[in-house]
């Protein structure tokens, strides 16, 4: 082989090596982006105050809270800049996790809030969702949703793709629609959730929906999806307890019937049916219900 041929071969080998090295770096960089150190995280702030839930965010407690502002569009264009400013606030006390939301809207008259009955939701409404994974295992957890009208919904993740919407939680929330958007205040009692008191890190995620634009805005997401597997982290939860693990919820149903085509048309039959729901947690990861 002559000298020119030798130089050409060396150059070819060098070029092949550089291309191969570059290709190898692509998955390595992708893996680096997916490492736990890159997962968003917030540290919990503890307070002795208990907010009065009116949806106004005007109490000093919210000035102590951690503020979450680094949101992106989840749908339709994942990771694009959201169309509206979105803020969530997180703080906790001895008995509950408190979450506030401040949603700026440049067209507040366009806020979609149709349903007025608890438990019912309509496609295309504005709203928010909070996902909690108390065991931080990326497989289980809870979802709490709320509309501008204060309509609440909750579900239990059987796995990352299956939610049991029949699960009923004990929690409270209030909302206010105003001339710059809408705000919300949420209180989730720790006795509602199953968790290990020794675990101070939970999975957490936030979503805002702008109904008229069919836009979902989120904190963490992957492939336009939000679930326990792709949530952020809430750290520093210390000194919290589940209590006795027994919750009692009393209720009643009143019905009134009247037969119009009978001799006793003026007589009505009123029935009162009391009810009692018992929720018991024999272990941190198991809840039993009895009605």
Segments and roles (model prediction):
Residues 13-27:
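Bacterial N-terminal signal peptides
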Residues 1-12:
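N-terminal secretory signal peptides that target proteins for export/translocation
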């Amino acid at each position: 082989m002559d000298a020119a041929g030798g130089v050409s071969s060396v150059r070819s080998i060098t070029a092949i090596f550089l291309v191969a090295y570059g290709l190898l770096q692509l998955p390595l960089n992708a893996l680096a982006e997916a490492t736990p150190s890159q997962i968003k995280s917030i540290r919990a702030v503890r307070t002795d105050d208990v907010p009065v839930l009116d949806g106004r965010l005007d109490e000093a407690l919210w000035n102590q809270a951690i503020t979450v502002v680094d949101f992106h569009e989840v749908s339709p264009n994942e990771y694009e800049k959201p169309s509206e400013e979105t803020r969530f606030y997180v703080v906790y006390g001895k008995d509950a996790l408190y979450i506030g939301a401040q949603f700026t809207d440049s067209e507040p008259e366009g806020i979609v809030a149709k349903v007025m009955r608890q438990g019912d939701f309509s496609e295309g409404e504005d709203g928010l969702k909070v996902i909690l994974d108390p065991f931080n295992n990326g497989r289980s957890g809870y979802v709490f949703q709320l509309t501008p009208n204060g309509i609440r919904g909750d579900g239990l993740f059987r796995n990352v793709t299956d939610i049991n919407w029949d699960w009923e939680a004990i929690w409270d929330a209030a909302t206010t629609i105003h001339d710059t958007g809408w705000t919300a205040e949420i209180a989730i009692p720790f006795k509602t959730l199953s968790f290990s008191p020794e675990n101070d890190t939970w999975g957490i995620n936030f979503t805002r929906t702008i109904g008229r634009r069919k836009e979902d805005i989120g904190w963490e997401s992957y492939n336009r999806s939000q679930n326990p597997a792709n949530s952020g982290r809430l750290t520093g939860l210390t000194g919290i307890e589940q209590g006795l693990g027994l919750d009692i919820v009393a209720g009643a149903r009143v019905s009134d019937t009247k037969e119009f085509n009978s001799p006793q048309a003026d007589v009505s039959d009123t029935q009162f049916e009391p009810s009692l729901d018992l929720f018991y947690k024999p272990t941190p990861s198991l809840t039993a219900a009895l009605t």
